[in-house]
Amino acid sequence: MERRTKIVCTLGPAVASADGILRLVQDGMDVARLNFSHGDHPDHEQNYKWVREATDKTGRAVGILADLQGPKIRLGRFKEGSTVWETGETVRITVDDVEGTHDRVSTTYKNLAKDARPGDRLLVDDGKVGLVCVSVEGNDVICEVTEGGPVSNNKGVSLPGMDISVPALSEKDIKDLRFALKLGVDFIALSFVRSPADVELVHAIMDEEGRRVPVIAKLEKPEAVAALESIVLAFDAIMVARGDLGVEVPLEEVPLVQKRAIQIARENAKPVIVATQMLDSMIENSRPTRAEASDVANAVLDGADAVMLSGETSVGKDPHNVVRTMSRIVRFAETDGRVPDLTHIPRTKRGVISYSARDIAERLNARALVAFTTSGDTAKRLARLHSHLPLLVFTPDPSVRSQLALTWGAQTFLCPKVDDTDGMMREVDRALLAMDEYQKDDMMVVVAGSPPGVTGNTNMIHVHLLGEDTRIPK
């Protein structure tokens, strides 16, 4: 059986060629991530084209995710490029545009002096350097260095616990979003989500561009953790972005946030990605640490739809080895069968039908579950149940097929639009009897809507024996 948990790979200089990306697809990449925190539009456009070319060559459906930078707060530039702050020193972070010195440097967050209060923490470079606000003098925030270390131009600053006043989309994000939509990406990931309402700003831009695609909420802020259930309901998918999350909330809370996010996302049939530092040591090394292997396996056993690679594939020494290694770890974890069952009992029509179809298929010892879908919803509702049976998904929409590349276990087939149930069964027979894995009279449990092609109309479970419809055109 194919690997069920999907792999997201971040593109970058290490794979920036047609052959490099083709090999990633062949190694097992299911979704390509364009990271708009780095690179420029021509770079992303070229990578996009290479992914689509690789999809055409291999026949594999590979989704493309545009990850917006978000309102990232950064230090300004230092006159010398960098400095080292020692523990116990006093430094000034100013909203004035100044050339940075050892003692005083600017920030991109122009409301810092208004929002900061004595006792507030400022964490630089993913928490490697720690500051605490002592006082505010005019446009300067006076800080004591609590954890010293090197700092350099444009390093990121996290403000855990501070009520900051920044929009969900920066001007750069809006430009990047419009560009990505015109390009044709399959997903948008929104950084530093704080509230369910943040998705409305993205939808407004999408409506102006005349194109809506799924929006992924990145869990990185304490506010997002507090509003987790409402954010899951508002967005189309979730990413547990453990890097920034581990800076913003206490480190020991991150594993439990991950488990809770996966559980809530599964209950609502929303795909969930676990991201950041999964095989981080493989940026330099040919083998992961044992802890990293356990981390990947535990994400699989928690029930994640996908696991994500960042620097490992974008700038790592051997990105192809990384993907193959992750795929091996995932496959072995999946053989264990310990993903907890969905304790949430569905109450909606589509939820109950998918739940019943899973039970029928497993009790009848069917060869596979089959879904016909125009939106992808039926497939996601079946996927969250994590049946041991293959999940074969038929759709007439190429974009839906690409979007299902993020959904656990979904093996997708592009098919023509059909007019009735007989047409569906003919498409199932045509596709599956051409494969070595399936033979005539194999039992399939098919979930669909009748009449076909109506979004949200899932209302049918059909037990089908391959080849029983003799009207398949020769």
Curated annotation (Swiss-Prot):
Pfam families reported in the protein's UniProt record = PK, PK_C
Q: Where does Mg(2+) bind?
A: 220, 244
UniProt catalytic activity: pyruvate + ATP = phosphoenolpyruvate + ADP + H(+)
- This protein's record includes keyword Nucleotide-binding: yes
Record flagged with keyword Magnesium: yes
Q: Give the keywords, sorted.
A: ATP-binding, Glycolysis, Kinase, Magnesium, Metal-binding, Nucleotide-binding, Potassium, Pyruvate, Transferase
> Where do the annotations place ATP binding?
35-38, 74, 155
Q: Which GO terms describe its molecular function?
A: ATP binding; kinase activity; magnesium ion binding; potassium ion binding; pyruvate kinase activity
**Which cofactor is essential here?**
Mg(2+); K(+)
Q: Where is this site: Transition state stabilizer?
A: 218
Q: Which residues form the signal peptide?
A: none
Which of this chain's residues are annotated to bind K(+)?
Answer: 35, 37, 67
Q: What is its EC number?
A: 2.7.1.40
Major enzyme class: transferase
Please state the pathway this protein functions in, per its UniProt record: Carbohydrate degradation; glycolysis; pyruvate from D-glyceraldehyde 3-phosphate: step 5/5
Residues binding substrate are 33, 243-244, 276
State the family it belongs to. Belongs to the pyruvate kinase family.
> Partners and quaternary state?
Homotetramer.
| Protein name per its UniProtKB record | Pyruvate kinase
Q: Write down the species.
A: Corynebacterium efficiens (strain DSM 44549 / YS-314 / AJ 12310 / JCM 11189 / NBRC 100395)
